[in-house]
């Protein structure tokens, strides 16, 4: 039994939190891009 396996153990909650933060950031970015596009379309109609 070496030290290898114990080093690779990560806290599952940390992994989940990391994924959640990434997902939220990605969603915010997409929303912002859609908002910018909508604003451009709106301004071109005036």
From Swiss-Prot:
An example Gene Ontology molecular-function term: hormone activity
Residues where Isoleucine amide is found: 46
Species the sequence originates in: Locusta migratoria (Migratory locust)
Segments crossing the lipid bilayer: none
Source organism superkingdom: Eukaryota
Secreted listed as a keyword: yes
Family named by the database record: Belongs to the sauvagine/corticotropin-releasing factor/urotensin I family.
Keywords: Amidation, Hormone, Secreted
Protein name stated in the entry: Diuretic hormone
Location (main, coarse): secreted
UniProt function note: Regulation of fluid secretion. Stimulates primary urine secretion by Malpighian tubules and causes a dose-dependent stimulation of cAMP levels in the tubules.
Disulfide bridge map: none
Localization of this protein: Secreted
Gene Ontology cellular component annotations, sorted alphabetically: extracellular region
């Amino acid at each position: 039994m070496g030290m290898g396996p114990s080093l690779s153990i990560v806290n599952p909650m940390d992994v989940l939190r990391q994924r959640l933060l990434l997902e939220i950031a990605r969603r915010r970015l997409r929303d912002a891009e859609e908002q910018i596009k909508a604003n451009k379309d709106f301004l071109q109609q005036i």
